[in-house]
Amino acid sequence: MRRAVGFPALCLLLNLHAAGCFSRNNDHFLAIRQKKSWKPVFIYDHSQDIKKSLDIAQEAYKHNYHSPSEVQISKHHQIINSAFPRPAYDPSLNLLAESDQDLEIENLPIPAANVIVVTLQMDITKLNITLLRIFRQGVAAALGLLPQQVHINRLIEKKNQVELFVSPGNRKPGETQALQAEEVLRSLNVDGLHQSLPQFGITDVAPEKNVLQGQHEADKIWSKEGFYAVVIFLSIFIIIVTCLMIIYRLKERLQLSLRQDKEKNQEIHLSPIARQQAQSEAKTTHSMVQPDQAPKVLNVVVDPQGQCTPEIRNSTSTSVCPSPFRMKPIGLQERRGSNVSLTLDMSSLGSVEPFVAVSTPREKVAMEYLQSASRVLTRSQLRDVVASSHLLQSEFMEIPMNFVDPKEIDIPRHGTKNRYKTILPNPLSRVCLRPKNITDSLSTYINANYIRGYSGKEKAFIATQGPMINTVNDFWQMVWQEDSPVIVMITKLKEKNEKCVLYWPEKRGIYGKVEVLVTGVTECDNYTIRNLVLKQGSHTQHVKHYWYTSWPDHKTPDSAQPLLQLMLDVEEDRLASEGRGPVVVHCSAGIGRTGCFIATSIGCQQLKEEGVVDALSIVCQLRVDRGGMVQTSEQYEFVHHALCLFESRLSPETVE
């Protein structure tokens, strides 16, 4: 009987244990990673084995004792299985909240300045609730705070770190109030933390902003919203660039069409030329007195292609042009005095076959104008014309540019020594260097021309381009050969593009056979003066180098005073070096600013000696010697302003 009663009691206890009455939640000790992964967790259910054990025991009991109480005992299964029902596992519940509502991974949006990151050697995927509780208590003890004030915000598996924050003592549940990380770390007992939590292997405790800020910012950038923002920004940028390119292309097409229209409408009108009647028409057989015949007038119209079309009109219907040479305002290269293409074919430069340049009618007319044009201005007239800029512009447009046809220079490969392929030296006034050998004609070439001065003085100036890397030796050879006392440089080394190379040394340099020494440097307001000594063998020459740097890019100076002062200083040095060679003047191409300086210098001498000035004749004379001198109408006006400023300084006694 005792055996019959004891066995069911034992089965009852086993079923109670299987129902969870004595064991609390055994799955609390599962790893955090198992809960976090949201995968189904299979928990071993003790009740299944216990059920099997009970069934076996009952079968044995029935077999041995055959007691009528067997039916009553077998009914205990339903009572045992229904007592203390186990709730189904819900993965949405936080593992840390199941046993301790105060200990949970909160995942709150805490500012980076309030977050502390603790780096562990221990794998954080193995942390369960017990270990996290120990960790929180250890951190709280090291800070001297309550464990409830230490909050584990999240676990960072990639870097094996625990992110936590500390709340004030009066924090209410659900609030995100937290203390500053820097303030918390100042009160942290690091040694105590390592001693109290040795099993975690704490390697570093730092604010979140120094450890994870870059990662968070990168996560924000490559988030869905960040990706859309980048795509939108790139799309807007591409649209803007495309619109700018379209506008630029439309502007280029408009300028091209306007330029083509100007070329089509370009005409040169010559003054009427009386045509003599044929002798057979002028005489009558039976009369000694011949009536005067109204002379017919031949008008010659030269189209842009250089073809002459004669047109005969009666003199009574012919209107005389107020100017002997009138030209509509056109571009710089169209006014070059030649219809030959400006493109220089480098492959044809090596040809040694001699050729003869034939002047076209237009070139002959242009040269006649350059040699005869004149407009003498008194001092009062000079002041008046300076106030009328439109008159100066119209006058400038009538002056032929007189650029040189490349075929006129019979030197193979001379294009390698030209800075600009359309700016070439006039052959009649070209500076020829002494050849290194008889067969090397290229060694005699330099892009420079002798320029006549006041009263037609020969070789008063040399106008040349800014030296290039391969022409620096040629430049110094020319200065030595011509015994030039002064060099005037009116350009910077670079203005958007390279304008001139640095062709002088800092102290001493050797260029070919010429040694150059810098003996002194003087800084003035608008230019720098260098005293140079040139040596070749036992001979020496003293040269002054003026570097004018105040000329602005792509326009004329606002005031002519600095250039006028430079001109006066150069003129003083030239007079002190009487008997020596020409003054060398260069800018970049050797025609624009160079022409302004030389024209101003000649005009000032004329005003000083005669009391009048003929700027038109001066510029025409310069273009005969070197094509394109005084390159733009703005520079032509600037020359008149400089002459007017010089005139205002002359004494009233100067004869007009």
Curated annotation (Swiss-Prot):
Q: Signal peptide: which range, if any?
A: 1-23
| Mutagenesis / variant outcome for changing residue 338 to A | Loss of phosphorylation by PKA, constitutive MAPK binding
Listed under catalytic activity are: O-phospho-L-tyrosyl-[protein] + H2O = L-tyrosyl-[protein] + phosphate
Which residues are exposed on the Cytoplasmic face of the membrane? Answer: 248-656
State where substrate binds. Answer: 553, 587-593, 631
Annotated consequence of substituting residue 338 to E: Mimics phosphorylation by PKA, prevents MAPK binding
KW Cell inner membrane (keyword) present: no
Question: Which domain of life does the UniProt lineage start with?
Answer: Eukaryota
Q: Which ranges are annotated Polar residues under compositional bias?
A: 274-289
Record: active site: 587 (phosphocysteine intermediate)
Whom does it interact with, and what assembly results? Answer: Interacts with MAPKs.
Entry protein name: Receptor-type tyrosine-protein phosphatase R
Species: Mus musculus
